[in-house]
Amino acid sequence: GRGIEPFFISSYNLPTHPQIYVLSNVRKDGKPIGRDGAGTHWHSDSTFTEKPSSVTLLHGVVVPARGGDTLFADTADAYERLDPSTKALIDGKRAIHRYQRKEFVFSGDRAVDEAERAEIERLKALRLAEEAATAPSPTAQRSNREPDRLHPLVRTHPVTGRKALYLNDEMTVGIEGMPDAEAVPLLHRLCEVATEPDRVLRFKWRQGDIVAWDNAATVHTATFTPPDEPRVMHRLTVEGTVPV
């Protein structure tokens, strides 16, 4: 069987159990105990690797009273809802996946109001200023250093054989053989189709919850967590295969 894989930036992994990746806005002695602000865009995990994670398991260790929900969308359903001309356009195409630093960007929740959006921008400015005054974060150090990966834009599920869109709203940066002026709007449109609000499942965490999902058939995003609401999540991912 496939094994558990550690997150590729070891600074964010639990020292006693390095396969566990820590996501948290909590700080100890002024330093973050995990990665803060990650995953607030629609994505499937580790698409910038040769063999992206097949399954993700997330454990709610400390759950905020406000924010920090996880939203899910079904990318197989999204593909099936596309019109025939769009399917013909994207079938057989390969998308370009690039690891980029994408922290404190926005909430993947389209329902965010202007007050919360302003709060997100304030937190983003604060975190970037903190980093500028110290050393670059491990994430920033790795930004754009990973090689680009080409994966099918329409992926066939390795178990069910069902076709699904395979994209990452921030790290899928283009389509092989297609001008960016055409590819980028197309990618954003496909993500919008997949994440139409009435097609999204919202999971509200309770302490101790564990959720597992299939990265070959879904995309997910975290919603914004206010900085005064502590959040600690432990993540495990299972090794995957080369997407086809």
Segments from the language model and where they lie:
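Non-heme Fe(II) oxygenase catalytic core, chiefly the N-lobe of the double-stranded beta-helix
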Residues: 1-210, 215-244
